[in-house]
């Protein structure tokens, strides 16, 4: 079974208690939810926009009957979901942001530049209509360049966008392998650098397709209103754009003058929490993870 990143650190901060209600806003394979349910006699409401995660929910239902509840949805709808379940307040909300290992490893989902598959990148095929193929084949060259630069921090964004525009004139770009080849034709891999040249471009397009940063902002805004006093919001993020949003929004909530919530918060960890050396050795994907948490006063 896959162990989610910073699991022990998340549990130490959340400190699940009997009789409390928690939300796993990014259910995935259910690692956080399972750990919370094993820690206390509590309830967990799990949310994930990926329909494929339902199979993991079914396993948890058998292990924890009546304790776990699941909804296929974007977590930006967290307020509507909980109110629909007759819940006004909860005691903790956890987020593990970004693409999951199982999504990356499934070539048919179109997230990976190392496995050829349809150029999709949607975390939900039923909720989202525009996939990565539509974007790269129909967006203006300037828009593609801006997305790759803004969301990927790619300094060769204009060269990549130009190469994409030239390639699609000949035939539509339909697979991850085709897109990765186009990017690699523009950027040569450095001998001293292990990161694939296509990494930043794929990250940027994925973020745009799924509106990930907008989702994160809305998720935090609504979560702040849903917590009981003593409740906690915990966010694990994997790149600087996400972490910057979390840091700024948490600072605003804790400043005492936030327009998001009139009730005060305080930082649980003033310094960002990172994975241990041992965890990085066991799971290299965790190397960029950062955990931030706040407490509702």
UniProtKB/Swiss-Prot annotation:
Record's keyword annotation contains Methyltransferase: yes
Stored HAMAP family: 16SrRNA_methyltr_H
Keywords: Cytoplasm, Methyltransferase, rRNA processing, S-adenosyl-L-methionine, Transferase
Cellular component aspect of the GO annotation: cytoplasm
Family as reported in the entry's similarity comment: Belongs to the methyltransferase superfamily. RsmH family.
Function in brief: Specifically methylates the N4 position of cytidine in position 1402 (C1402) of 16S rRNA.
InterPro entries according to UniProt: RsmH, SAM-dep_MeTrfase_MraW_recog, SAM-dependent_MTases_sf
Enzyme Commission numbers on file: 2.1.1.199
Keyword S-adenosyl-L-methionine attached: yes
Catalytic reaction list: cytidine(1402) in 16S rRNA + S-adenosyl-L-methionine = N(4)-methylcytidine(1402) in 16S rRNA + S-adenosyl-L-homocysteine + H(+)
Name of protein: Ribosomal RNA small subunit methyltransferase H
Matches recorded under Pfam families: Methyltransf_5 (PF01795)
Intrachain S-S bonds: none
Organism: Ehrlichia chaffeensis (strain ATCC CRL-10679 / Arkansas)
Main location: cytoplasm
BP GO terms, sorted: rRNA base methylation
Alphabetized GO MF terms: rRNA (cytosine-N4-)-methyltransferase activity
Subcellular location: Cytoplasm
Residues reported to bind S-adenosyl-L-methionine: 30-32, 48, 75, 96, 103
């Amino acid at each position: 079974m896959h162990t989610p990143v910073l699991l022990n650190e998340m549990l130490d901060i959340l400190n699940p208690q009997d009789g409390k209600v928690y939300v796993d806003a990014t259910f995935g394979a259910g690692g956080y939810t399972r750990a919370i349910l094993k820690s206390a006699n509590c309830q967990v409401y799990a949310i994930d926009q990926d329909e494929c995660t339902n199979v993991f929910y079914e396993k948890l239902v058998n292990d924890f009957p009546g304790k776990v509840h699941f909804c296929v949805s974007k977590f930006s709808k967290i307020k509507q979901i909980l109110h629909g379940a007759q819940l006004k307040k909860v005691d903790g909300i956890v987020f593990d942001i970004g693409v999951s290992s199982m999504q990356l490893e499934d070539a048919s989902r179109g997230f990976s530049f190392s496995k050829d598959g349809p150029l999709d990148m949607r975390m939900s095929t039923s909720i989202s209509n525009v996939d990565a193929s539509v974007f790269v084949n129909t967006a203006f060259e300037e828009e593609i360049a801006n997305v790759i630069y803004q969301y990927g921090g790619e300094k060769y964004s204009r060269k990549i966008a130009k190469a994409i525009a030239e390639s699609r004139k000949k035939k539509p770009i339909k697979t991850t392998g085709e897109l990765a080849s186009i990017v690699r034709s523009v950027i040569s891999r450095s001998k001293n650098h292990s990161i694939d040249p296509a990494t930043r471009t794929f990250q940027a397009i994925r973020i745009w397709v799924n509106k990930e940063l907008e989702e994160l902002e809305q998720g935090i805004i609504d979560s702040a209103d849903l917590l009981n006093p003593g409740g906690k919001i915990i966010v694990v993020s994997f790149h600087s754009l996400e972490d910057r949003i979390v840091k700024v929004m948490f600072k605003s909530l804790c400043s005492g003058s936030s327009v998001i919530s009139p009730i005060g918060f305080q930082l649980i960890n003033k310094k960002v929490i990172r994975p241990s050396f041992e965890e990085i050795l066991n799971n290299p994907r965790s190397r960029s993870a950062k955990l931030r948490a706040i407490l509702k006063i």
